[in-house]
A protein has these predicted regions:
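FIC/Doc superfamily catalytic core
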Residues: 1-195
Length: 195
């Protein structure tokens, strides 16, 4: 399968500049390489419970650790527009608003930790702050948030989320519903994967 074959609802991989390993020629190889890289972040953040201060620096650091052996731009906000996400000029401001909103939700306590994690996940996907890996990044940040708050972890069907059809279509529909302000579908979808 060619590397540039695009998956519906994903950032297209038309631009491979910044790809660190030079032996990768297919999307399958890229997915395997990235999964190995992401595992390092999972081990760092989900190995033992710790307090997490979610701020801009930390949000960039998580992405950097997830992709630092795969992409030169790991942990750096994108600097052009793609088919998904806010205009790249708005990324920094939107990320600041997200951090502020999360602090408000935590202080206000009108939303459960689970509902906060779903909104955090959704907003990161909607902003799409990085060139690629935003879905996996958003799910991991949400998992870290849950774990730090003594909540059960989610077991995402990552392979199924890479393939068009079934679960991926349900996931995208749930995200699109959240885009319109209704988090019910995304919460129901996410609940299916609680450990």
């Amino acid at each position: 399968m060619p590397l540039i074959e695009n998956v519906p609802g994903a950032t297209p991989l038309d631009d491979l500049s910044g790809l660190i390993p030079d032996h990768i020629t297919t999307r399958e190889q890229l997915n395997e390489w990235e999964a190995s890289n992401i595992l390092q972040a999972v081990k760092k953040y989900l190995n033992r419970r710790r307090e997490v201060e979610i701020n801009l620096r930390w949000l960039k650091e998580v992405h950097r650790i997830m992709f630092n052996e795969t992409w030169e731009w790991a942990g750096k906000f994108r600097q052009k527009n793609y088919n998904l996400g806010v205009d790249w000029h708005q990324i920094l401001e939107q990320m600041k608003v997200l951090v502020d909103d999360l602090q408000h939700w935590q202080a206000d306590r009108s939303l459960s930790i689970f509902s906060q994690s779903v909104r955090l996940h959704h907003r990161l996907v909607k902003i799409h702050p990085f060139v690629n890996g935003n879905g996996r990044y958003s799910r991991l940040v949400s998992d870290i948030f849950l774990f730090a708050n003594n909540q059960p972890l989610l077991v995402w069907p990552d392979k199924d989320l890479f393939v068009a059809g079934g679960i991926r279509e349900q996931y995208i529909a749930a995200l699109q519903s959240a885009d319109k302000g209704s988090f019910k579908l995304l919460e129901e979808f996410t609940t299916r994967f609680i450990k």
